[in-house]
Amino acid sequence: MLSVKGLHAFYGRAHILQGVSLEARAGEVVALLGRNGAGKSTALKSIMGLVPAARGEVTFEGRRIERLLPYRIARLGLGYVPEERRIFTDLTVMENLEVGRQSARGDAPVWTEERLFALFPNLAGMRDRPGGRMSGGEQQMLTIARTLMGNPRCVLLDEPSEGLAPIIVEQMAHSIRTLKGEGLSVLLCEQNLHFSQAVADRAYIVEKGQIRFGGTMAELASDSSLREQYLSV
């Protein structure tokens, strides 16, 4: 589905990603874990073409995409939910969803407004509410829903649980598991290990722009020294 090999990326002269390699298979949830500043968000942005890849390969469904513009990558079926959310605060929930609408490709699930309201029931009663009058958790749900309106086959989620109330985090975890059940692949970057353990099949740990671990969540759970070295705050 999604394969990254030897990815290098820079911010100016700062060498942020230093040979990152990872993959997300069809229908799989993969967590990219690490401390703040480790390179997690940059990895997602580089996959989406928002931060140019200096070296390395990014392959999506058999096609090399590391030289494509972000809008071309999105049209191929790769969705991206940024940490900043970036909803249109003056537009209603329905209008925000309409902005993200694209036709489905191949056998990707077709997401309608009603299916999205079933996935995020909190949004169902807010159809005419402006995005600027929503809580942080509601805005996060709306951002994911808007991305799903593009009918992607793989979704990149940047810190989906950050700053959310515990009950909203639980709802977010349920929604991600539902996406997996629909056959979507999900690559999420997180600092919240507990949340990642609730949703992910496999994990990678990134530290100083390099992958330090790749394996199942069970393997990570059994290695306390690894968690202490790379994930403790």
Predicted regions, residues:
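ABC-type ATPase nucleotide-binding domains, specifically the catalytic core motifs of the NBD
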Residues: 12, 30, 53, 68, ...
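The feature captures the beta-strand-to-loop junction immediately N-terminal to the Walker
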Residues: 33-35
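Helix-to-loop junction immediately C-terminal to a conserved catalytic motif
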Residues: 48
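Conserved ABC transporter NBD signature motif
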Residues: 56-65, 76, 109-113, 215
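Conserved ABC ATPase signature
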Residues: 130-134
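ABC ATPase C-loop
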Residues: 147-148
